[in-house]
A protein has these predicted regions:
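Ligand-binding pockets and gating/stacking loops
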Residues: 1-470
């Protein structure tokens, strides 16, 4: 359990109350850093720190593992026939009926690299880095609808209002950057069913929530000051505003007022750093081509490059959401389009981090909220054909870097891709693994709220996936 007896006191407030000079503040900061290193770590830091930061590529809508990673020739053999009742007994689905016919894979597969990992021909770039990836084919989740499943993957709960993974990391271990947020969110491809609760701070102090960068040419608004306002004038205005806010906080005691002060201060610092962060002109043409970045175009590729730049500058948790994978109809066309949008840049991010020497301590995670059914979804009433429904029982994700074992595959599914048959990995197990790679014991990182101790991985026993940790 983390305890913060002065959680809602700002540094500025404390220093003003005590009358400490700026020089002494700087000296105290240096001494504090040295003391922390000498006296040990927080109680929840129980493991070697293998990853210092996370870049999470969330594929909203749920990619079809059967068209990308999990090759099932048996489905082709029995296409058009119903799934055996013994396989589907007791299962629930969002749209299809239990007697829906089998749909075979829409694309050919091949083995790649020394690892022999199988990829469909829709992933020509990722397949080239097969030996850098840790593939998990035995993921399963508790939810079969998008909003709760997306929330479950990102916050550990299918109910809105819980703290997201990035918020937990910001709260627990902070950020390496003083002039950039510790938790940044970028989006492409459309809307998300889970909404902004997926990067919310929940019951944690709101300064730990994710900071969304906008889609388009200007990810951060109002970087430049209005005409006639220089940094000195802005600093004076901000100091006055903060003084008024502190006065209000002294009367009301609302911790959100302190969060607002922190937000204003971060915005002020970001104004100086953001232009350099977002300026791709110093990136080589080779790098731009590697990602597939086009000048003046904002998309998943440019978000991946910006994610690498944020990671270089100390942002702890960077979450990229790319939506559009919900293939209830025409799964073939869906996978063609979405894989084309993300394959090159996803692979480029891993390659770029590796050549910069950053992959070793940067964890990259790729995947959606659940998988897709081996059975076809077809409905004349809904104008759907040759699609796949939601499948929480088994799906595939991959990881790279950050202390994971490259070139291995964890878990298996049955010959139909319906059930996990080896090394099942629950969503909370994945979350526990990410925390452990960051040095954190997931059972000890908690926060007391309304009389309960909450943690990202819930109260049921879950464990990190030791097979994939180097």
């Amino acid at each position: 359990m983390i305890t913060h007896p002065l959680l809602h006191r700002t540094r500025r407030h404390f220093f003003q109350d005590c009358g400490i000079g700026v020089g002494k503040i700087a000296l105290a900061s240096l001494i504090a850093n040295e003391t922390f290193g000498a006296t040990g770590k927080p109680d929840f830091m129980r493991f070697p720190v293998k990853a210092k930061r996370v870049i999470y590529l969330f594929m909203g809508g749920a990619p079809s593992q059967l068209e990308l990673f999990d090759n099932k020739p048996k489905l082709q053999e029995i296409e058009g026939k119903p799934i055996p009742p013994s396989v589907i007994k007791g299962q629930r689905y969002a749209f299809i009926q239990p007697d829906a016919a089998v749909l075979g894979p829409r694309f050919p597969f091949a083995k790649h690299g020394q690892s022999g990992a199988e990829f469909s021909d829709r992933l020509p770039y990722l397949s080239k880095i097969a030996d850098d990836l840790t593939i998990v084919k035995s993921m399963h989740t508790d939810h079969f609808n998008h909003a709760p499943a997306q929330l479950f993957m990102t916050t550990g709960s299918g109910i809105p209002g819980r703290a997201s993974m990035g918020s937990w990391l910001s709260y627990g271990i902070g950020s390496e950057a003083d002039d950039l947020p510790g938790f940044v969110v970028m989006r492409s491809g459309g809307n998300l069913s889970g909404g902004s609760a997926m990067w919310g701070s929940g019951f944690l102090p709101s300064e730990h929530q994710g900071v969304p960068f906008r889609e388009g040419a200007e990810p951060i608004l109002h970087v430049a000051n209005p005409k006639g306002i220089d940094r000195t004038a802005q600093r004076q205005t901000l100091d006055l505003l903060n003084k008024l806010n502190r006065g209000t906080h002294g009367k009301m005691g609302d911790p959100e007022i302190n969060a607002r002060i922190e937000a204003y201060e971060m915005a002020y610092r970001m104004q100086a750093r953001a232009p350099e962060l977002m300026d791709f002109s110093k990136e080589s043409q080779e790098t731009l081509d590697l990602y597939g970045v086009k000048k003046g175009k904002s998309n998943f590729a440019s978000n991946c490059l910006l994610a690498r730049r944020l990671a270089e500058r100390g942002t702890r948790f960077i979450q990229l959401y790319h939506s559009g994978w919900d293939a209830h109809s025409n799964v073939e066309g869906n996978v063609k389009n979405q894989a084309k949008a993300v394959d090159q840049a996803s692979a480029a991010l891993v390659q770029d981090l590796k050549r910069l020497g950053m992959l070793e301590d940067t964890l990259v995670v790729w995947g959606g909220e659940f998988g897709r059914t081996p059975m076809v979804e077809a409905s004349a009433a809904l104008n759907r054909s040759n699609g796949r429904d939601h499948h929480p029982q088994a799906f595939t994700m991959w990881m790279a870097g950050g202390g994971t074992k490259p070139g291995i595959t964890v878990g298996k599914t049955d010959e139909l891709g319906f059930h996990v048959t080896e090394d099942p990995v629950h969503v909370h197990d994945l979350q526990a693994t990410i925390l452990e790679l960051m040095g954190i014991d997931h059972t000890r990182l908690s926060f007391r709220f309304q009389g309960l101790d909450f943690r990202l991985t819930g109260v049921e026993p879950h464990h990190a996936i030791k097979k994939l940790i180097a």
